[in-house]
Swiss-Prot record:
Organism the protein comes from: Danio rerio (Zebrafish)
Limits of the Protein kinase domain: 24-286
Gene Ontology biological-process annotations: signal transduction
Stated role: Does not appear to have detectable kinase activity.
Membrane topology: Peripheral membrane protein
Swiss-Prot/TrEMBL keywords: Calmodulin-binding, Cytoplasmic vesicle, Membrane
Pfam families in the cross-refs: Pkinase (PF00069)
Taxonomic lineage: Eukaryota, Metazoa, Chordata, Craniata, Vertebrata
Protein name: CaM kinase-like vesicle-associated protein
Length: 436
């Protein structure tokens, strides 16, 4: 039975806060995130350390849904390369999640500390993450926020395993997903293009991760000023939609053709042509001996220190808010010049969310194969395109803002949290299907 569900006539039985403190010593706050506070916790009996995430119910419906979503997802998974949920408590005021504690370093820090670093080291990292992602995908779970900051070593031993953390954006794939979320630099074209999407977005993100680990550079580099976030985001999205990246010299000169081939097949703009996680595991660069053992540390480390010390890769931002902001100038012009035309051009899905949810398989197929035309639309203007221009009328409506009930855009009066420190853009995933 999904978390939080009760049988008819059954009364909710809450834990008392003392039950938690009787079992665990809770330390000081380690980090505050958008929906929760993170503590270190020690089991009083075993003295084992854990990570504790506390969600306050008073912070609103979105926080309560975020907590329930993460609990539902984590209760489903058990894999050596995923941090495991150990304990869950619900009081009248909070949710407490206790998870395994990873004491190792982030992948970047590990690379910088190595005396020798090669493609084979990268292949070992990618293989472990791919196996975890293939497992998630077998359960129809989409992580939606795979990035280097969420890949950590389990401990500080020499041959420590890699684990994936942070499942607050993960979602069960019950049909294609619509709301955009994730970290901008890792977004797949179908997310940027406001199309329906699914598990292939995780494979795209793994391609971005692999590109960075082999070169020290992000694939969609932009020369915009560090503080010019708006132009940076526009240019970034254009490049993602077009798949506009290269294996630049001299950074890729020493990298094998097999590695480049795998990156290209993971970062395929057409999600239907993109490798699945299991197909990537079977690639010769992962499962064979194609990965080079040549030392590439000097070049990679120099580029990592140059590119990833910048705040733009860690900035906290909501994807939906950012997309609305990038479209704002044209939307304001359109509203001022043709309010009547705007209403006339609205598609059935914009006028009626239920109608949008009942689109035909043909329309969904067209949406999943439209990145190239979407890229042309974005090149002609500065907006992020709307979803699924399946015909001329829908294409003319594509410049209008997405319907609020369909894409869960945060309310204007709600400020973007400033406490988030891991660069995630957030969209809330409801779990009403599971808790119903």
């Amino acid at each position: 039975m999904p978390f939080g569900c009760l049988k008819p006539g059954e009364k909710k039985d809450y834990n008392s806060p003392t039950e938690i403190t009787d079992k665990y010593d809770l330390g000081q706050i380690v980090k505050s995130e958008e929906f929760c506070e993170i503590f270190r916790a020690k089991d009083k009996n075993t003295l084992k350390m854990y990570t504790c995430k506390k969600f306050l119910k008073k912070d609103g419906r979105k926080v309560r849904k975020a907590a329930k979503n993460e609990i539902v997802i984590l209760k489903m998974v058990k894999h050596p390369n995923i941090l495991q949920l150990v304990d869950v408590y619900e009081t009248r005021k909070e949710y407490y999640l206790f998870l395994e504690l990873a004491t190792g370093r982030e992948v970047f820090d590990w690379i910088l500390d190595q005396g020798y670093y090669s493609e084979r080291d990268t292949s070992n990292v990618i293989r472990q993450v791919m196996e975890a992602v293939a497992y998630l995908h077998s359960l129809k779970i989409v992580h939606r926020n795979l990035k280097l900051e969420n890949l950590v070593y389990y401990n500080r031993l020499k041959h420590s395993k890699i684990v994936i953390s942070d499942f607050h954006l993960a979602k069960l794939e019950n049909g294609l997903i619509k709301e955009p979320c994730g970290t901008p630099e890792y977004l797949a074209p179908e997310v940027v293009g406001r199309q329906r999407y699914g598990r292939p977005v995780d494979c795209w993100a793994l391609g971005v991760i692999m590109y960075i680990l082999l070169s020290g550079n992000p694939p969609f580099y932009d020369e915009a000023d560090d503080d010019d976030y708006e132009n940076h985001d526009k240019n970034l999205f254009r490049k993602i939609l077009a798949g506009d990246y290269e294996f630049d010299s001299p950074y890729w000169d020493e990298i094998s053709d097999s590695a480049k081939n795998l990156v290209s097949r993971l970062m395929e703009v057409d999600q239907d042509q993109r490798l699945t996680a299991q197909e990537a595991i079977n690639h010769e660069w992962i499962s064979g001996n194609a990965a080079s053992d040549k030392n590439i540390k000097e070049n990679v480390c120099a580029q990592i220190e140059k590119n990833f010390a910048k705040a733009k890769w860690k900035k906290a931002v909501r994807v939906t808010t950012m997309m609305k902001r990038l479209r704002a100038p044209e939307n304001q012009t359109a509203a001022a010049t043709a309010p009547a035309a705007e209403a006339a051009a609205a598609s059935p899905s914009e006028a009626d969310p239920a109608a949008g949810a009942q689109e035909t398989p043909q329309a969904a197929s067209e949406a999943s194969t439209a990145p190239s035309s979407t890229a042309e639309s974005l090149s002609a203007s500065i907006e992020v395109p709307a979803v699924e221009p399946a015909n001329a009328e829908a294409a003319s409506a594509a410049v209008q803002p997405p319907a609020e009930p369909v894409v869960h855009v945060p309310e204007p009066e709600q400020p973007v949290p400033t406490s988030r420190c891991n660069g995630e853009a957030s969209a809330l995933d409801t779990v009403e299907e599971q808790s119903g």
